[in-house]
């Protein structure tokens, strides 16, 4: 059984005891799409060849600005899922965030049906968290372009979710932008070197931020 985690900041395919991670960023490289960390490494070097909103804006509306042969964001999602699935086949369960609109879920299921997998179930990501925690709580999710908060209730050993509240603009990429700006200002004030003036040094700065955030989880400063 396969499990697809559909948060664009943590897109994962779980298969048996292993997982494949490809966050929702696409890079058009010599006519071919590449996704995940490979695309992330080019985000500041080649911004015109990057799209990081195709999951957030999943639809069949014409893609603007254009990015290669994709007609719309649904085409990019299809290509992303092809890359994520690889040679996987069989039944698949979708873990869907509360931020995904019903029309987007319907479109996603249609895309899934064109791939060598069969959707056998859809579950709310927050319900999975609630079942794991086994008590009432609020599930805060960080997506690429927004955050969301979903209340979770427990009754008779079952987790149920309330209405998801969206926090537009408070996503992972916005957080990284804000941190990069603050760090860049410190560089300028202390060394007169501005890492954001050149694409290569700006990219290097951006790539360091996730590991800095991880370190701050256990350290007061880094």
Briefly describe each language-model feature range.
Residues 1-29, 131-162, 179, 209, ...:
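Gly/Thr-rich phosphate-binding beta-strand-loop-beta motif of the actin/hexokinase/Hsp70
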Residues 9-95, 213-220:
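Conserved phosphate-binding loops in N-terminal lobes of ATP-dependent enzymes
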Residues 45, 49, 72, 76, ...:
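Charged, alpha-helix-enriched surfaces in structured cytosolic catalytic cores
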Residues 88-99, 195-196, 200:
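Short glycine-rich phosphate-binding loop at a beta-alpha junction
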Residues 94-104, 205-210, 214:
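Glycine-rich phosphate-binding loops at beta-strand->alpha-helix junctions
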Residues 101, 120-131:
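Short acidic loop-to-helix transition motifs that present clustered carboxylates
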Residues 110-118:
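Short helix-loop-beta junction
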Residues 154-222:
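Phosphate-binding glycine-rich/basic clefts of nucleotide- and phosphate-handling proteins
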């Amino acid at each position: 059984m396969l499990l697809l985690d559909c948060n664009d900041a943590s897109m994962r395919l779980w298969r048996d005891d292993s997982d494949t991670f490809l966050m929702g960023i696409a890079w058009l490289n010599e006519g071919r799409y590449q996704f995940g960390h490979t695309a992330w490494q080019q985000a500041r070097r080649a911004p015109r060849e990057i799209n990081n909103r195709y999951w957030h804006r999943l639809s069949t509306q014409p893609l603007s600005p254009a990015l290669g042969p994709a007609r719309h964001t649904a085409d990019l999602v299809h290509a992303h899922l092809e890359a994520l699935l690889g040679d996987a086949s069989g039944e698949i369960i979708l873990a869907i965030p509360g931020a995904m609109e019903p029309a987007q879920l319907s479109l996603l299921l249609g895309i899934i049906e064109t791939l060598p997998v069969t959707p056998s179930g859809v579950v709310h990501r927050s319900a999975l968290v609630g079942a794991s925690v086994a008590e009432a709580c609020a599930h805060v999710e960080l997506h690429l372009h927004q955050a969301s908060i979903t209340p979770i209730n427990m009754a008779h050993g079952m987790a149920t979710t309330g209405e998801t509240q969206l926090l537009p603009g408070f996503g992972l990429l916005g957080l990284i932008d804000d941190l990069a700006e603050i760090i860049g200002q410190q560089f300028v004030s202390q060394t007169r070197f501005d890492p954001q003036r050149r694409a290569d040094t700006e990219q290097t700065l951006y790539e360091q931020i996730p590991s800095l955030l991880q370190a701050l989880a256990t350290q007061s400063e880094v």
